[in-house]
Swiss-Prot record:
The lineage of its organism: Bacteria, Pseudomonadati, Pseudomonadota, Gammaproteobacteria, Enterobacterales. It comes from the Bacteria. This is C4-dicarboxylate transport protein. Coiled coil: none annotated. Responsible for the transport of dicarboxylates such as succinate, fumarate, and malate from the periplasm across the membrane.
Length: 428
């Protein structure tokens, strides 16, 4: 029993995170030097994301009987994303207005260090809807894979899958090669995941060593408010959606606990993307649905980021005593419904989109970003965890709506009645 516990990735990552926190707190200078360990692990994961998405989407689409099903899946997924992300934005807006974590700070915007957020404000100027749509189209296929742009790779994979499907029996050889290549890629993922504890340790040691617990205490009310809101969203909103779909959100969270710990350690939801593609398929969702919903969700279904954006914007308004009446808040909500979709594939995307939103709204000081710059890193864990759970739930819901979900397999796996790889007939 003890041997199996020590070999568990869940236990190893949890232990590594704890050691990283202790090292960063008591030996901050050494903790800061651990940054390459976390960065290296995330880079290894990002290295493999593009080929994983390509193989999963191509084999999923090419193996489908009807191409109409692909279009239906995409439309249903986008509808779900828009509804749930809107709910997340509204919940964030309500909670921050009720708790008012920024009230009483009385910060003069002219005293804030605008230089500290200048880089985010500059990048925000390019984050328009048209620019976002144009960025989905790659200048070259090789460039899409080289840059690791998820949406560009996804677009090419969908087109490739459609073309391969139209070839029929002539494309069988190519299909078999890609499927075999996919097995090799997932073998590489298994090897990389053995390094997850090292990556989690390095990332956590750096975070605590660099920013310290003092930053947490200074703006702790906003952090606590944000974490509680994310928990309520997962338990109440996603939990209700899960119950209506026929599964328990708590059993699902237990099923993806290793992926959640990896995300907690690295603060990057992308670090769990390859494993999520595999685990959602093993849970009973059709490969074509998983291949479309998970990668697209990383751009259009960022529930945690949506909550963060509304709370951060209103917090800055409260702290700087900027006017935020009902009209301003509705305007903020409408702007965020559009601007939040431009966060895909951008480093520091939350901050960039927030800067773009503050600029678009007009009456909120962009320099106010400096207030939360120091604690943003501590809130990124909750954002990433909520995003991951949200995309997992979305995959199951969409699979059910388009009748591509194996209900028996879902129930068996979540209740530990069947091994992950066992298959059943699709239910209608």
């Amino acid at each position: 029993m003890k041997t199996s516990l020590f070999k568990s990735l869940y236990f190893q990552v949890l232990t590594a995170i704890a050691i990283g926190i202790l090292l960063g707190h008591f030996y901050p200078e050494i903790g800061e030097q651990m940054k390459p360990l976390g960065d290296g692990f995330v880079k290894l994961i990002k290295m493999i994301i593009a080929p994983v998405i390509f193989c999963t989407v191509v084999t999923g689409i090419a193996g489908m009987e009807s191409m109409k099903a692909v279009g239906r899946t995409g439309a249903v997924a986008l509808l779900y994303f828009e509804i749930v992300s809107t709910i997340a934005l509204i919940i964030g807006l309500i909670i921050v207005n009720v708790v008012q974590p920024g009230a009483g700070m009385n910060v003069d915007p002219t005293t804030l260090d605008a230089k500290a957020v200048a880089v985010y404000a500059d990048q925000a100027k390019d984050q328009g809807i048209v620019a976002f749509i144009m960025d989905v189209i790659p200048a070259s296929v090789i460039g899409a894979f080289a840059s690791g742009n998820i949406l560009q790779v996804l677009l090419f994979a969908v087109l490739f899958g459609f073309a391969l499907h139209r070839l029929g029996s002539k494309g069988q050889l190519i299909f078999n090669v890609i499927e075999s290549f996919s097995q090799v890629i997932f073998g590489i993922i298994n090897m990389i995941m053995r390094l997850a504890p090292i990556g989690a340790f390095g990332a956590m040691a750096f975070t605590i060593g660099k920013y310290g617990v003092g930053t947490l205490v200074q703006l702790g009310q906003l952090i606590i408010c944000f974490y509680i809101t994310c928990i309520l969203f997962v338990v109440l909103v996603l939990g209700s959606i899960a119950k209506a779909t026929g599964f328990s959100i708590f059993k699902f969270i237990r099923y993806i606990r290793e992926e959640l710990l990896i995300v907690l350690g690295t603060s990057s939801s992308e670090s769990a993307l390859p494993r999520m593609l595999d685990k959602m398929e093993k849970l009973g969702c059709r490969k074509s649905v998983v291949g479309l919903v998970i990668p697209t969700g990383y751009s259009f279904n960022l529930d945690g980021t949506s909550i963060y954006l509304t709370m951060a914007a209103v917090f800055i308004a409260q702290a700087t005593n900027s006017q935020m009446d009902i009209v301003h808040q509705i305007t903020l909500l409408i702007v965020l419904l559009l601007s939040s979709k431009g966060a895909a594939g951008v480093t520091g995307s939350g901050f960039i989109v927030l800067a773009a939103t503050l600029s678009a709204v007009g009456h909120l000081p962009v320099a106010g970003l400096a207030l939360i710059l120091g604690i943003d890193r501590f809130m990124s864990e909750a954002r990433a965890l909520t995003n991951l759970v949200g995309n997992g739930v979305a995959t199951i819901v969409v699979a059910k709506w388009v009748k591509e979900l194996d209900h028996k397999k879902l129930d068996d796996v979540l209740n530990n009645r069947a091994p992950d790889g066992k298959t059943h007939e699709l239910s209608s």
